[in-house]
Amino acid sequence: MTQTGPTSPLPPPPTGKRMLSEQVYAHLRDAIMRGDHAPGAALKPQDLAREQGVSLAVVREALVRVVGDGLADRLPNRGFAVPAYSDRRWQEIAEARRTIEPVLLRMSVERGDVDWEARVRAAHHRLSRTPPYTPEEGEYYSEAWSEAHRLFHRALMEGCGNPVLLETFDRLWTASELARRWSTHRNPGRDGVEEHRRLEEAALARDADTATEVLVRHLTLTAEGLTAQG
């Protein structure tokens, strides 16, 4: 009879406070992404605690996580606020993306295996078949398209095999997505479908130079479209 060693204990179930913090975090994140809180608006822990029926400690824990996502700023007086909409902020985010994402993409092209290729192809297929706008959501990108768009870009980067770099990608993506959702489609002459097709084609052809060139151009056009109107 084969003997086995002692099994590792299961992780403890989430406590009530942890569950509440998760719920408040998810609510805050969704509310900010929907635009329920205007750019620059204060996120007052006392008000949020009263609205959600939870303690200040739970709200503060959730707010710290939202700050980590790039969806809120922590102010010098220890308050919190939604990031203010400014050209400088979004151009800084765009510069960071243009610096980091081409490196990740090149690593993916060089390291990605056949499973990575399949994920990229599937993500691009989903994106290409998802309408960017719906009558219900007007001139803003639809939730379904926004998620398909994120999954495609994430799939392109996943072949890099570096979870730390992917965490950086996720944070920058969330911050730029917030800016994009606050803006409308300001470049109607842009052919995003073709840009994504060229990205997929170059990546799967293992042409790192072309893939990164297309990506930089893609990110530059996105940054130009997110420039705040005067």
Residue ranges and their predicted role:
Residues M1-E110, T227-G230:
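Short linear motifs at protein or domain termini
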Residues T2, G16, S128, T174, ...:
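C-terminal all-alpha effector/ligand-binding and dimerization domain
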Residues P45, G161-P163, R206-D207:
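Short loop-to-helix capping motifs
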Residues I93, V120, W145, H149, ...:
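Hydrophobic packing residues in well-ordered alpha-helices of helical domains and bundles
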Residues A96-G112, R150-R186, G225:
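Hydrophobic, amphipathic alpha-helical faces that serve as interaction scaffolds
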Residues I100, A123-R126, T130, Y141-A144, ...:
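Amphipathic coiled-coil alpha-helices
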Residues I100-P132:
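Amphipathic alpha-helical dimerization/coiled-coil segments
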